[in-house]
Structures are given as structure tokens and as C-alpha cells.
Amino acid sequence: TPVEVFEACRAFCSEMCDDPDCRDTVIYGGNNWYYAYGKSSAREILGDSAYLAEMTEGIENRPFMVMDDGWQIDHSDSYNGGPWRVGNADYGDMGELAAQMRAKNVRPGIWFRPLYDHSADIPAEWRLERNAEVFDISVPEVLEHIAQDIRQLGDWGYELIKHDFSTYDIFGCWGFEMGTRLTNGSWRFHDHTKTTAELIVRFYEVI
């Protein structure tokens, strides 16, 4: 029955983590991906924010409005990676946009893909052996770079971060493609002393 399935899922989650970071309030809201698909603007995001605020009028726990892919400076139809320190012309000042969203009575949220960045100034030692456009999470400087990206998003005023594609970028395939192997080929992380699980846990701790 549905109840038994739910309880089974709860039990499974408890086995995975016996000290979860639970919130006192419900996290809910909107995300513009499933109609914009990366083609939006500050004007449209503010319109989305106003609509969401109207739909949730009177609710003390305010909703998040998540701005998905498309805001970053190098966004194009064929690229959805970083850098993440500035928005493109359709979005303008990202801190000002967050403030305008908050003024609409929603909580600002933002999307980013932390491990994918083709910027020419990224050191070669930070790159994954398997794909030079992807960061190697075993490199300490990479984790600090990602931490700085996240600090920037927070300093702009975004309260929720949707970080995306991370396991795909690390392994080079989706979960349903893995089968008996997590990845393809014989590549390795720069740091050979830690397991993949240890590296991913540290990566998520940094985020």
C-alpha cells in the first residue's frame, strides 16, 4: 500500500543517515526551468516572483522562487556551465535582482552547476582526467573555488541554491547508465588516497 511504501522509504532514509539536517518549516515554491528551459530574464523572473507571491498570499512561510539555468555570463544553447561570479545582460546585477525578488515577497533561489566550467584561466591541474571542462573534486583548490562561488551566490542574497549535474559531471554518465560500473574508462582522480565516496562526501560538505 502507499502507506507501507512511505514507511519503507522513511526507514531506508534513516539507515542512510541517522542524524538528518531537518528543517522546522516546509520548503516549497517555484522553479522556472520547466517552462523557460534556460531562456529567461530578470523581467520574467520578477513576473514569476509576483505570480508566486499572489498564489501564496497570507502564508507566513514564504515560498522560494528558484531562477534556473540561463542567468550565467557564458550561457548559450550549447553550454550551461560557469563561471558563476556574474550574470549576463538579460539579468543584470544579480544582487539587485535578488533584492527585487525579495521585495515581491518571495525568497530568492538560484541554480548552478558547480563542476562544469570551461574558463580559460582555470589551472590544468584542477581539471578532471576524463573531461577537461569538469573540475576534479579531489583537488583542494577546486573545493575552495566552489566554496567561493557559493559565497558569491549567498552574498548576492540567494537563500536557496539548486546545485545540479554533480554526479553526472563526476562520473560521466547518469545513474540509469551505470549498470555494474559507476563510470567508463580507466581514469583516476588526482588524489589516489581517498575513495570516491570520501571525495563526494567532502564535496557536499563544502557545498
Regions found by a protein language model. Give the residues of each.
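Carbohydrate-recognition beta-sandwich/jelly-roll modules
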Residues: T1-P63, L160
